[in-house]
């Protein structure tokens, strides 16, 4: 078993174990694999009071309110994720509490990251746009304000000092009433690029969610296209637009987001919902795999040559 990194070798060990379980581990077993996607990340909608938004299986696995982190459980989690090739975890809810960025919580996140690192898993955090205002009394969240930009640079430096391989931020902004760059007459690109500049020295990325809608929109299913298509090519290289598979909200059956195939010069990542918000909560057992497969295999016919959405 060999690979280009310790994580790759770990994936190889799990591949051999799978072959053994399936009765395929014979002497001519020869598997060569390379991940198609660079980032394979779980977003946890865990809150700092240990509740979990749309969580139907108990309280937060990170146990934010406990004195010590649940190290044994986090080791099990890391092994579970690595066994299926996942390499990143966003620890907190996209509807973020600004306190995730205070000194106490950064130290706790660093303890978690120290364990996840053993399994090739990079740690990320969700942030609230108004954090500079809430935590340090800044008067504005304008992404073109030098004071705001410097605040985020300082915060990225502080986090990276505690977590050298910190992955970056996941951002929900100007959606469902939450603040964002549009509150200051700026664009999603202005906001994302400010954060991208802050994490770039440490190799970080910004995952900017395209789940944006407001009651005033005349066509909610197309609002992401209306807000992002004109910004194609304006985002920094380390910004990825995170797009839900459906244009409304993870509905069991709905068309796929019209934003796929509309961004030719901007990296995209697809967001699926594993928790059963629309599929029976904790009352039913539903297999999601075929839904994901259907979405990834769809051909985008409006492009010059039919292209799988996965591409």
Please place each PLM-identified region on the residue numbering.
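Acidic-and-aromatic substrate-binding clefts and catalytic sites of carbohydrate-active enzymes
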Residues: 95-107, 177-180, 186, 213-220, ...
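Polar, glycine-rich mid-to-C-terminal structural blocks
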Residues: 204-287
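Conserved protein kinase catalytic core
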Residues: 132-134, 178, 311
